[in-house]
Structures are given as structure tokens and as C-alpha cells.
Amino acid sequence: MERITFWNNKGGTGKTSLAFQTICQYAHENPSEKILVIDVCPQANLSELLLGGLHQGGSNILLQRQGATPRATIGGYFQLRLPSPYTPPSFTAQDFLTQPYKYNKNIPENIDLLCGDPMLELQANAISTLANNQIPGTNTWIAIIDWIF
């Protein structure tokens, strides 16, 4: 499985635009491959863009996904993982995914999205603490990183 990451701690560098264009182009060129986009940004700009952007109500669609049960975002996924962080979940990650093409006809059908969420700001400290706990017989860092991988 190939992984591509866009990251820069500085805002305004073009991460969202570059990621959006790369994802869509790759999806068009490789229609038989499934692409999972994980938006790990509390601002969720990439999610909004994939869901329709400014002109097609991407922000409102994202709010709907955040209001779903379960909350169909990475924050919703983490919210259910936090109470039992070191054990396998009783739910499936599929419950949190969104198919952007259902909301934005310009997005290829082979793209799935785990939407960004403002809750990540609040969850970051808890997740960091859990990853750094010292529990005999448990590699807590791997257990937490495994939530995504």
C-alpha cells in the first residue's frame, strides 16, 4: 500500500490545493485503485473542498457529516477509540468514511474520505498522553498509531 502525506506546520503554503489536485489527478489516472484520504487537520479545508467547496456547499455537507451518528469524521473515530485505546474496536472504520462523489459530482468515485474535524484540537493532548503511557507488555505508541494504520 502506497502512502502519500502532505504536511507543513506553516499555514498558507498550499497544502490543501496541492493535496486536492494530486488526489484527484491520481484518482483519474488510476480508476481501478481505491484512494483513502485522511484529513488530519482540525480546519478540515481538504474535506470541505472534496465535498463541494465554497460554491457547492462543502462546508454545510461537512457539518452534516459531523452531526451524523456516529460522527463521520476522524474526530468521531477517535472519540470512540479514546475510552478503550489499547484494545481492538468493536466497530468498523467504514462507519466513519464519506464518499465525496455522492456530494460533489466532480470527484472520482474511487476516493473515500475520512473527514477532518475541529475536535482534533481537543483530542490531540489525550492521544499524545495515551501514546506515551508506560504499560508493561504494551507498546502504547504502536497501539495508538495503529488506530490509523
Q: What are these language model-derived features?
A:
Residues 1-149:
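P-loop NTP-binding core
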